[in-house]
Curated annotation (Swiss-Prot):
The keyword Chaperone applies. Residues 175-258 form the PPIase FKBP-type domain. Belongs to the FKBP-type PPIase family. Tig subfamily. It is found in: Cytoplasm. It catalyses: [protein]-peptidylproline (omega=180) = [protein]-peptidylproline (omega=0). Consists of 3 domains; the N-terminus binds the ribosome, the middle domain has PPIase activity, while the C-terminus has intrinsic chaperone activity on its own. This is Trigger factor. Involved in protein export. Acts as a chaperone by maintaining the newly synthesized protein in an open conformation. Functions as a peptidyl-prolyl cis-trans isomerase. GO terms for cellular component: cytoplasm. The gene is tig. Keywords: Cell cycle, Cell division, Chaperone, Cytoplasm, Isomerase, Rotamase. Its EC number is 5.2.1.8. GO terms for molecular function: peptidyl-prolyl cis-trans isomerase activity; protein folding chaperone; ribosome binding.
């Protein structure tokens, strides 16, 4: 149903369509249009030179009569800019961004009557007040107890620090490590070079780290062995830009892990094996606590996503679904090592999962920004700097470049703010849930 909002300078008529598509007519007052007209004339004056006048000093009426096309073009741009901003300041369906404008046109342009500008654009979702009273999280589970078996597994992992790694010529067997490179190429293009998906990646031939199908391909093979596969799935061919996968075994490595004793424990800054076990237990308990907190965080995300429904912008949703679908199909083909036939059977299920994941992710994106704003949450300078350092390490490694451009710095700031906005909003949801759980119902 059409709606109208206005102030002394602008009026905005809005009509909404599914998918957060909005049609708007912005009416610009004569006063605003005349002010913008003066700005346009001033700019044109600075760009031209007229005989008998110093640059920028020609009378307005002379400029308007001699350069009407230039003035009208400049004025049109200024009017469109002001009308666009009015969509947010006067209207209540803010565009996602300038790029979200599908079309715009000036339908009236008169210094006596004002201007009219029509827009079609994608807007931020309209989200109602959150019904916090309906927020519900599962009862929090205690962190996992650390068993003696966990300690032994931890010692085995520590033992890898002292392990002897020997390249062998014999065929690979259970427990070995293998170094693999994976390339993709086009079978029907002799001139095309292969592209690396990964190089010299290490895998352990074990049930814990490989799917059965993947492990089976690389048991009983030697260094230099190649596994060549043809991709028949059109989606995977499109994603990888090729139809042939070549796995090359660079090395088969036998690993011998010694038993950890007091001497080796002292090399790890522990007083004895018992002291190392005690320190390991503390570390594993911290990891278990972190895992518990992450699970609770995920439960809060799930609860928030279910708290309220609203329409999502069509283009953002389609883009996110496409991205997640790609990730899921590639993961199934290259990591879980599904055959093309198995992938075809699972494809509809994976696409459905991608649609659900994309919908949830976008809902949480908009909901967390709403919570951050509504609840007046804040980000300290120290928090922002810490998160910028995290983002920088993820992007550049431990040694970021000395000279970072302003654009790159701005990207790091935005990434850090987005992460902190999201995490602080979810933490607020957790506090709300705890408060509701501790408040007796009437």
């Amino acid at each position: 149903m059409p709606r109208s909002l206005s102030n002394e300078q602008f009026s905005v008529d809005l009509e909404e369509s599914p998918g957060c598509i909005v049609s708007a007519l912005v009416k610009v007052s004569p006063e605003v249009l005349n002010k913008l007209n003066k700005q346009a004339l001033k700019k044109i004056k600075k760009e031209i030179t007229l005989p008998g006048f110093r640059k920028g000093k020609a009378p307005d009426d002379v400029i308007a009569s001699r350069y009407p096309t230039n003035v009208r073009k400049e004025l049109g741009e200024l009017v469109t800019q002001d009308a666009y901003h009015a969509l947010s300041t006067v209207g209540d369906r803010r565009p996602l961004s300038p790029k979200a404008v599908r079309s715009n046109s000036i339908t009236q342009f008169d210094l006596q009557e004002g201007a009219k500008v029509e827009f079609s654009y994608e807007a931020f979702p309209a989200i109602s007040d959150l019904p916090w009273e309906n927020l519900s999280l599962p009862q929090e589970e205690a962190a996992s107890e650390i068993s003696d078996s966990d300690i032994e597994k931890g010692l085995t992992n520590i033992g890898m620090f002292f392990a002897t790694k020997t390249p062998v010529e014999r065929p690979s067997q259970e427990g070995d490590f293998i170094s693999i490179s994976l390339h993709v190429s086009k079978s029907n293009d002799e001139n095309a070079s292969s592209a690396a998906i990964f190089e010299n990646k290490y895998f352990k031939l074990s049930e814990e780290e490989m799917t059965d199908a993947f492990k089976e391909k690389f048991l009983g093979i030697s260094t230099g062995h190649r596994v060549v596969e043809t991709i028949t799935s059109p989606e995977i061919q499109s994603f990888l830009r090729g139809d042939t996968l070549t796995f090359t075994v660079n090395a088969v490595i036998e690993v011998s892990i010694p038993e950890i004793d007091d001497e080796k424990a002292r090399q790890l800054q522990a007083e004895s094996l018992d002291d190392l076990k005690a320190k390991l237990r503390i570390q594993l308990e911290k990891q278990a606590k972190d895992k518990q907190l992450q699970k609770r965080f995920s439960e809060a995300e799930d609860a928030l996503a279910m708290l309220v429904d609203f329409e999502l912008p069509t283009s953002l949703l389609e883009e996110r679904i496409s991205l997640i679908t790609r990730e899921k199909l590639l993961n199934a083909r290259l990591i879980q090592y599904c055959s093309d036939e198995e992938l075809e059977k699972r494809k509809s299920e994976l696409i459905k999962e991608a649609e659900e994941d994309a919908t949830k992710a976008l809902k949480l994106l908009f909901l967390t920004h709403k919570i951050f704003s509504d609840e007046k949450l804040t980000i300290s300078r120290e928090e922002l700097q810490y998160m910028m350092d995290v983002c920088s390490r993820e992007r550049f490694g431990q040694q970021p470049p000395k000279d970072i451009s302003n654009d790159t710095l701005q990207e790091l700031v935005m990434s850090a703010r987005d992460r902190l906005t999201y995490s602080k909003a979810i933490e607020h949801v957790l506090r709300k849930a705890e408060l509701l759980a501790s408040t007796p119902s009437a």
